[in-house]
């Protein structure tokens, strides 16, 4: 059926009036499309391209800012780790110094206590020796006076006690 239509059109010849009408209509339609559709479409495409370009630029700037923030954060983290390490080191040094001070102070206190104890012991020993010396002197006098049956004078008594104490001192030294 299509073939008969085409054959009939060719047999009659070309209708130049219709052909020109179609071409003029096509050109008018093309001008209208260009004026009302093509220009707004190209404007819209240009705006879209500009927006995409701006979005890409904004994304690049945001990426750069993010990288800068990451670098700043890494630097701050590194600095805080360094500061923490320094604080720990200082605390350790202070602790060691306090430990040494405490040990030194305790050692000095022990030495002082030992010295005081030695002084006290020496003083007590001397007091005990003096007391024993007096007791021995009194006992010696009593014994001597009973043996001799006479009273010794104070000088005789003192000489007797001194000689007795010297004898005791020599006995203690030999031990």
UniProtKB/Swiss-Prot annotation:
HAMAP family: ATP_synth_b_bprime. F-type ATPases have 2 components, F(1) - the catalytic core - and F(0) - the membrane proton channel. F(1) has five subunits: alpha(3), beta(3), gamma(1), delta(1), epsilon(1). F(0) has three main subunits: a(1), b(2) and c(10-14). The alpha and beta chains form an alternating ring which encloses part of the gamma chain. F(1) is attached to F(0) by a central stalk formed by the gamma and epsilon chains, while a peripheral stalk is formed by the delta and b chains. GO terms for molecular function: proton-transporting ATP synthase activity, rotational mechanism; proton-transporting ATPase activity, rotational mechanism. It is a single-pass membrane protein. Coiled coil: none annotated. It is found in: Cell membrane. It comes from the Bacteria. Pfam families: ATP-synt_B (PF00430). Its main location: membrane. Gene3D superfamilies: 6.10.250.1580. Disulfide bonds: none annotated. GO terms for cellular component: plasma membrane; proton-transporting ATP synthase complex. InterPro entries: ATP_synth_B-like_membr_sf, ATP_synth_b/b'su_bac/chlpt, ATP_synth_F0_bsu_bac, ATP_synthase_B_chain. The chain crosses the membrane at residues 13-33. F(1)F(0) ATP synthase produces ATP from ADP in the presence of a proton or sodium gradient. F-type ATPases consist of two structural domains, F(1) containing the extramembraneous catalytic core and F(0) containing the membrane proton channel, linked together by a central stalk and a peripheral stalk. During catalysis, ATP synthesis in the catalytic domain of F(1) is coupled via a rotary mechanism of the central stalk subunits to proton translocation. Keywords: ATP synthesis, Cell membrane, CF(0), Hydrogen ion transport, Ion transport, Membrane, Transmembrane, Transmembrane helix, Transport. Belongs to the ATPase B chain family. This is ATP synthase subunit b.
């Amino acid at each position: 059926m299509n073939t008969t239509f085409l054959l009939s059109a060719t047999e009659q010849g070309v209708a130049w009036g219709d052909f020109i009408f179609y071409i003029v209509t096509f050109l008018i339609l093309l001008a209208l499309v260009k004026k009302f559709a093509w220009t707004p479409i190209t404007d819209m495409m240009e705006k879209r391209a500009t927006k995409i370009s701006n979005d890409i630029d904004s994304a690049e700037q945001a990426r750069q800012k993010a990288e800068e923030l990451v670098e700043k954060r890494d630097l701050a983290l590194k600095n805080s780790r360094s500061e923490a390490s320094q604080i720990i080191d200082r605390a350790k040094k202070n602790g060691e110094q306090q430990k040494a001070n405490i040990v030194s102070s305790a050692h000095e206190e022990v030495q002082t206590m030992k010295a005081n104890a030695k002084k006290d012991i020496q003083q007590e020993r001397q007091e005990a020796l003096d007391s024993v010396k007096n007791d021995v002197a009194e006992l010696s006098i009593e014994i001597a006076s009973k043996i001799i049956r006479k009273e010794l004078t104070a000088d005789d008594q003192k000489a007797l006690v001194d000689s007795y104490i010297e004898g005791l001192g020599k006995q203690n030294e030999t031990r």
